[in-house]
Amino acid sequence: MKKLLSLVIIVVGIIADQVFKNWVVANIQLGDTKKIWPDVLSLTYIKNDGAAWSSFSGQQWFFLVLTPIVLIVALWFLWKKMGQNWYFAGLTLIIAGALGNFIDRVRQGFVVDMFQTEFMDFPIFNIADILLSVGFVVLFIAILTDKETK
């Protein structure tokens, strides 16, 4: 049952990410901004050929090699730790986010980013980035609370 739940979460995460990215591309000009919540959140369409803070900009080969490795390792750990809820949640979200951005990189050579925080200076990000970030936080909690690793 957990395998099916993991698959559903991954598929829903990827679909949400891809549908929203396509909506942004169709409705916002590259570089333009639409205010969503004044002084809090805007949608700004950018093409990101790197990672957060534009690190590794222009290094698509790096992501095209690294992402499948991360996915294989995450899937292996997910299989091994399926019964542990924190690992299950974290790894499932990481896989969904990694696949969401990987699809963009393979299809377009860049990732579509759109969420811009207005209240602090932070890189523009997308749904896949949210899934990855939350997944890594949850995985970190899993590792810290895992009795086997202590």
From Swiss-Prot:
Bilayer disposition of the protein: Multi-pass membrane protein
Organism (species): Lactococcus lactis subsp. cremoris (strain MG1363)
Superkingdom as given in the UniProt entry: Bacteria
EC class name: hydrolase
EC number(s) from the headed UniProt entry: 3.4.23.36
Active site: 113, 129
Protein name, UniProt field: Lipoprotein signal peptidase
Pathway membership: Protein modification; lipoprotein biosynthesis (signal peptide cleavage)
A GO BP annotation: proteolysis
Entry-linked PROSITE patterns: SPASE_II
Function recorded in the entry: This protein specifically catalyzes the removal of signal peptides from prolipoproteins.
InterPro entries registered for this protein in UniProt: Peptidase_A8
Keywords annotated in UniProt: Aspartyl protease, Cell membrane, Hydrolase, Membrane, Protease, Transmembrane, Transmembrane helix
Location(s), subcellular: Cell membrane
GO molecular function annotation: aspartic-type endopeptidase activity
A Pfam family this chain is assigned to: Peptidase_A8
GO cellular component: plasma membrane
Main localization (coarse): membrane
